[in-house]
Regions:
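Hydrophobic/aromatic residues in alpha-helical transmembrane segments
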Residues: 33, 74-75, 114, 141-142
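Alpha-helical transmembrane segments of multi-pass membrane transporters/permeases
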Residues: 47, 117-144, 159-166
Length: 173
């Protein structure tokens, strides 16, 4: 049982690493948008960028959805590239976790973009509070969904960790 749990954690960590790399790589739009919003906010010329924020949100949503869908569809190829030859049950844990987390890719990118807009408007408090709320929800749901809760919620293991993260992201959005 301990070995199985360690394998699940290893796969979760590797899959999380790939998802995090994609999110932070693609979230550089946030940095650009933050700088542009900040410059125009400081010079009181927000009218010049009123269409930029919705356009960036739409582009992020489309790009994140396409990449998320491709990752779900081509998971087997990505997994073999990243993990090499792995045991079937370990592969299945990774697949379950990764596919759920890939659904959240566009959500993660939108959250990062919102944080960039907040920073551009010199309002870092909102991003901090939203992050704290998301983190607390994720931790709470991790415990419940991974280990279960009485007879009402059965333990979900690594899949529960993925659902906890996705749920926290939805609340943050």
């Amino acid at each position: 049982k301990t070995v199985r749990r360690q394998r699940q954690m290893c796969i979760r960590d590797r899959s999380s690493g790939l998802i995090a790399t994609l999110i932070w790589g693609l979230a550089q739009m946030r940095t650009s948008l933050s700088a542009i919003v900040s410059r125009h906010f400081g010079s009181d010329h927000l009218d010049k960028i009123k269409s930029l924020i919705p356009q960036t949100f739409l582009m992020t949503l489309i790009l994140g959805s396409i990449i998320g869908a491709l990752l779900i569809f081509y998971f087997d190829v990505v997994a073999i590239f990243l993990f090499g030859d792995i045991e079937e049950h370990t592969f299945n844990y990774a697949k379950d976790y990764f596919k759920i987390r890939a659904i959240g890719l566009p959500i993660s990118l939108l959250i990062a973009l919102f944080f960039g807009v907040f920073r551009g408007f010199q309002n870092t408090s909102w991003a901090m509070y939203i992050s704290l709320i998301g983190g607390v929800i994720n931790i709470f749901l991790d415990v419940i969904l991974i280990h279960g809760f009485g007879d009402s919620i059965k333990p979900m293991g690594v899949e529960g960790a993925a659902w906890a993260s996705l749920t926290a992201q939805l609340v943050m959005l």
